[in-house]
């Protein structure tokens, strides 16, 4: 094997060893053993919330261990692959080994990004809200396209998605939608998506086929856990009930099952209509309200810290990514400069490259 390839393999070994240390592989094995014991408890499903968390945590831990062990095995096999290529003496065998080296580098770098998720709430599940912005019906359609993009991303990773509320626009698309992604580190991963997303395309709703620019805002919150102590006095909440509605304003329920919660002190409003009963919708809406209040508390603490540090802090609420479908095709993140020339793939949920670039960018910003 030539020295350059040996150096590449040695560098990957150093990176993977660091990843294994940060992830604490031995500790991960012990955690899996404990979760397997918990999962085998015949009384586990007496508490469905705890049961779902145990099974979800077990699945994630097992997948993470398989992933890092698989990378180690592939890296150990790589020198052998080059030896076999040298013995065969053909260019095709060397090209195959080089392709595996390149793919392994990509996979190890992706795993390395996981070690950067060390924020206070990064390991939490996520609550995502998408709102249409300027651009009329095109913006509503764009908001629905973004919702589909994130749900497709979750599906590709086998992450369960729970839709809390969808407010449909009159002609097409959605005014807003709120859903949860139930996966460890979903918040740390998706939080880099928070901000304004811009779409440029030929409008399918314009009779003259003119180019239209549309905007939609993405908000990402961590799911609240019992340890967060987000207590809301009953007198601080106004509860309104109404009938669930579907596309075009049509009623999809003959009972007043949809719930709107208004937090009186802050004016925060949360709606939920996707569950079958009023009680279920109220429980789901309360979870989202708690997440919003937790985020409000976190931002207030961050503002106080920024004031003490003498800077104005940073805001994610600005335009952060542009999706151009016409006159050329390009999706570009304006913070990281990461770009992809295949918008169809991105809109179908292939956003891992943007997420990884965003996490690395955020980590560098936090270090500054």
UniProtKB/Swiss-Prot annotation:
Q: Tell me which PANTHER family the record gives.
A: CLASS I PEPTIDE CHAIN RELEASE FACTOR, PEPTIDE CHAIN RELEASE FACTOR 2
- Reading the lineage from the top rank, the first entry is Bacteria
Q: Where found?
A: Cytoplasm
Q: Which residues cross the membrane?
A: none
Q: Which SMART domains match?
A: PCRF
Q: What is this protein called?
A: Peptide chain release factor 2
- Show the GO cellular component annotation of the record: cytoplasm
Give the HAMAP family listed for this entry: Rel_fac_2
Principal localisation? cytoplasm
Q: Cross-referenced SUPFAM superfamilies, in alphabetical order?
A: Release factor
What this chain does, per the record?
Peptide chain release factor 2 directs the termination of translation in response to the peptide chain termination codons UGA and UAA.
Q: Does the keyword Transmembrane helix apply?
A: no
Q: Which InterPro entries does the record associate with it?
A: PCRF, Pep_chain_release_fac_I, Pep_chain_release_fac_I_sf, PrfB
What is the recorded post-translational modification?
Answer: Methylated by PrmC. Methylation increases the termination efficiency of RF2.
On whether DNA-binding is a keyword of this UniProt record, the answer is: no
Task: Please provide the record's keywords in A-Z order.
Answer: Cytoplasm, Methylation, Protein biosynthesis
GO molecular function (one): translation release factor activity, codon specific
State a single Pfam family of this protein: RF-1
């Amino acid at each position: 094997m030539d020295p350059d390839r040996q150096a590449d393999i040695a560098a990957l070994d150093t990176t993977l060893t660091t990843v294994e240390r940060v992830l604490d592989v031995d500790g991960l094995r012990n955690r899996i053993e404990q979760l397997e014991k918990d999962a085998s408890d015949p009384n586990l499903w007496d508490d469905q919330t705890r049961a779902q968390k145990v099974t979800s945590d077990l699945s994630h831990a097992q997948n993470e261990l398989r992933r890092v062990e698989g990378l180690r095995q592939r890296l150990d096999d790589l020198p052998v692959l080059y030896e076999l290529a040298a013995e065969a003496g053909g260019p095709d065998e060397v090209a195959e080994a080089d392709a595996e080296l390149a793919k392994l580098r990509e996979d190890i770098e992706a795993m390395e990004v996981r070690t950067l998720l060390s924020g206070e709430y990064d390991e939490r599940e996520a609550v995502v809200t998408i709102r249409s912005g300027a651009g009329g019906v095109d913006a509503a359609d764009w908001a629905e396209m973004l919702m589909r993009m994130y749900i497709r991303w979750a599906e590709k990773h086998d992450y369960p998605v729970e839709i809390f509320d969808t407010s449909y626009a009159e002609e097409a698309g959605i005014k807003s939608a709120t859903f949860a992604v139930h996966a460890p580190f979903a918040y740390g991963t998706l939080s880099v998506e928070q901000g304004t997303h811009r779409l440029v395309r030929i409008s399918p709703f314009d009779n003259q086929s003119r180019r239209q620019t549309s905007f939609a805002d993405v908000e990402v919150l961590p799911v609240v856990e019992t340890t967060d102590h987000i207590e809301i006095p009953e007198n601080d909440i106004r509860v309104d009930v109404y009938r669930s509605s579907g596309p075009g304003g049509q009623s999809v329920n003959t009972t007043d099952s949809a719930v709107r919660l208004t937090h009186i002190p802050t004016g925060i409003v949360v709606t939920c209509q996707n569950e079958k009963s009023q009680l279920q919708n109220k429980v789901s809406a309360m979870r989202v309200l708690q997440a919003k209040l937790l985020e409000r508390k976190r931002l207030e603490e961050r503002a106080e810290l920024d004031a003490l540090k003498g800077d104005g802090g940073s805001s994610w609420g600005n335009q952060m990514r542009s999706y151009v479908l016409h006159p050329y095709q390009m999706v570009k993140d304006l913070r990281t400069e990461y770009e992809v020339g295949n918008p169809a793939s991105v809109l179908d949920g292939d956003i891992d490259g943007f997420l990884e670039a965003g996490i690395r960018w955020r980590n560098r910003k936090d270090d500054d």
